């Protein structure tokens, strides 16, 4: 993914920052110490706090002295910690902010974002109200802030902090105060009591360098995020039992959110945090940067998502509901069971037109090399989650009742069974028994997905001794799917001009063709 940063700052805003460069004040006007000060000599700490100089003094000292001062470094750190990150894939982060505003770093908290068309149709909202418990005193009175960056969320950086009384380590998320930031904190606070949601310890409202910030202290999970764990062990697919346990825990959190009419809208492996790495690991849902709680029976329309996990209705900029989370859960299950995503970009960008088309039409498959060991029940669960029609997808309550999540044994003969006859191959090679007719289907497959196994014509069934049918099917499946994609998105098929293609084979054939005179009968 690519992130855009805007380095230029308005001259008037820059002058305003310079006037507050060494000091900040709270609501009562009393001076505050910036908690993001990391001086090497604690003995000089008191000397570093001084009265804000006048504009004339600033001009006299010059810009160079200001840039070299410790407070300039602190100010840069706190502003960087509240930097808004934007995915460069033509997707806005929320309906409360315009796309132009999202692509810029806001250097002044008092700067108002441009009004979007959707905001213009709604009545103006009143002053932001605090709907969650919030401390007004300085966070440095209770915690020691570390320069360690734990991670980067959708709306800001996550830093390490330590409680002064106990020395216990926590995670600190710094958010520039805004309507969107307050909604994130509010929704996280409403659900943080759940055992599978990252819990909140304290919330502070502080002002640093005239920038009003919300600081959220949350529990620190030693295991990190699930994607990092998965990649650290080589992206080796998890067993169905382990995936079922992960989905059971995260599904409990999602069910808790959905019952409160809250859509997370950014479920992905990076936002699933782990208490450890062992079998007794507790998985928790975090990062509410995209979360939203619409009114009952009101659909959402802002395209908030991560491309790999985005459902068709979100990419198509249609109205959608909480079922978008179910699609994302299906993608997460797919990745954990095979090691790669069902939808991918072939051009090195976050969301290519071809990937968008594959998502919109649910073009994916279960290659035999990785999926032969996965049960039909689990594959069908993924099919039911990755349905293009949101109303046809499994709900979170239905998913929690599946054998994968409950751990119940699979009922024989309930799902599709297939088998191919290959002489000299035992049942373990074919994945089933041997039949003379070569292809048996006991039940129809999900209609809106690519067929898992295609019938093999007799003309190519026995190309050579010892060939394995699953691999043969996989090749045919890939070719067929590629042809379907070409027919579906013809604008992505580029035909070069033969005279300008610089193709060596074409040039040789053209030279031979020109050197041999044509004979007409």
Swiss-Prot record:
Composition bias type Basic and acidic residues, residue spans: 13-26
Residue ranges of domain Protein kinase in the record: 144-405
Residues reported in the UniProt entry to bind ATP: 150-158, 173
InterPro entries: Kinase-like_dom_sf (IPR011009), MAPKAPK_C (IPR027442), Prot_kinase_dom (IPR000719), Protein_kinase_ATP_BS (IPR017441), Ser/Thr_kinase_AS (IPR008271)
Keywords per UniProt: ATP-binding, Cytoplasm, Kinase, Magnesium, Metal-binding, Nucleotide-binding, Phosphoprotein, Serine/threonine-protein kinase, Transferase
Cellular component aspect of the GO annotation: A band; cytoplasm; nucleus
Expression tissues: Expressed in body wall muscles (at protein level). Expressed in intestine.
GO biological process: adult locomotory behavior; behavioral response to nicotine; intracellular signal transduction; protein autophosphorylation; protein phosphorylation
Cofactor requirement: Mg(2+)
Catalysed reactions, semicolon-separated: L-seryl-[protein] + ATP = O-phospho-L-seryl-[protein] + ADP + H(+); L-threonyl-[protein] + ATP = O-phospho-L-threonyl-[protein] + ADP + H(+)
Name of the protein in its database record: MAP kinase-activated protein kinase mak-1
């Amino acid at each position: 993914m690519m992130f855009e940063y805007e380095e230029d700052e308005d001259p008037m805003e820059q002058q305003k920052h310079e006037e507050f460069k060494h000091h900040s004040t709270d609501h009562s006007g009393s001076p505050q110490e910036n908690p993001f000060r990391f001086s090497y000599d604690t003995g000089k700490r008191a000397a570093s706090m001084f009265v804000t100089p006048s504009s004339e003094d600033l001009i006299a000292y010059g810009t160079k002295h200001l840039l070299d001062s410790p407070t300039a470094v602190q100010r840069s750190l706190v502003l960087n910690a509240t930097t808004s990150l934007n995915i460069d894939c033509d997707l806005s982060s929320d309906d409360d902010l315009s796309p132009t505003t999202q692509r810029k770093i806001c250097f002044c908290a008092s700067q108002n974002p441009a009004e979007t068309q959707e905001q213009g149709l709604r009545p103006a909202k009143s002053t932001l109200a605090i709907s969650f418990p919030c401390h007004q005193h300085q966070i440095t009175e209770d915690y020691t802030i570390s320069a360690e960056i734990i991670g980067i969320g959708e709306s800001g950086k996550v830093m390490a902090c330590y409680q002064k009384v106990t020395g216990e380590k926590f995670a600190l998320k710094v958010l520039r105060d805004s309507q969107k930031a307050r909604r994130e904190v509010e929704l996280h606070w409403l659900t943080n009591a759940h055992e599978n949601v990252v819990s909140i310890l304290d919330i502070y409202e502080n002002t640093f360098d005239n920038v009003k910030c919300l600081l959220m202290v949350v529990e620190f999970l030693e295991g990190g995020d699930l994607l990092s764990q998965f990649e650290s062990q080589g992206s080796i697919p998890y067993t169905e039992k382990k995936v079922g346990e992960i989905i059971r825990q995260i599904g409990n959190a999602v069910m808790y959110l959905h019952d409160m009419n809250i859509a997370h809208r950014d479920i992905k492996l990076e936002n699933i945090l782990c208490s450890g790495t062992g079998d007794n690991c507790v998985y928790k849902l975090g990062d509410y940067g995209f979360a939203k709680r619409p009114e009952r029976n009101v659909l959402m329309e802002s395209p908030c998502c991560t491309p790999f996990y985005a459902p068709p209705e979100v990419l198509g900029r249609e109205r959608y509901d909480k079922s978008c989370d179910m699609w994302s859960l299906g993608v997460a299950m797919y990745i954990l069971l095979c090691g790669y995503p069902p939808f991918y970009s072939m051009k090195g960008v976050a969301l290519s037109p071809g990937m968008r088309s594959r998502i919109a039409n649910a073009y994916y498959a279960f290659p035999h090399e990785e999926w032969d060991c996965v049960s039909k029940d689990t594959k069908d669960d993924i099919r039911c989650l990755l349905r293009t029609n949101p109303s046809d997808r499994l709900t979170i309550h239905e998913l929690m009742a599946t054998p994968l999540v409950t751990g119940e044994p699979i009922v024989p003969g309930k799902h599709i069974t297939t088998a191919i006859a290959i002489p000299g191959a035992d049942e373990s090679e074919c994945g089933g028994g041997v039949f003379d007719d070569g292809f048996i289907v006991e039940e129809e497959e999900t209609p809106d997905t690519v067929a898992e196994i295609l019938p093999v014509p007799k003309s190519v069934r026995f190309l050579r001794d010892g060939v394995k049918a699953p691999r043969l099917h996989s090749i045919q499946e890939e070719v067929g799917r590629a042809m379907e994609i070409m027919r579906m998105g013809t604008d992505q098929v580029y035909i070069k001009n033969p005279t300008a293609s610089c193709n060596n084979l074409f040039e040789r054939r053209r030279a031979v063709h020109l050197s041999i005179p044509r004979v007409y009968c």
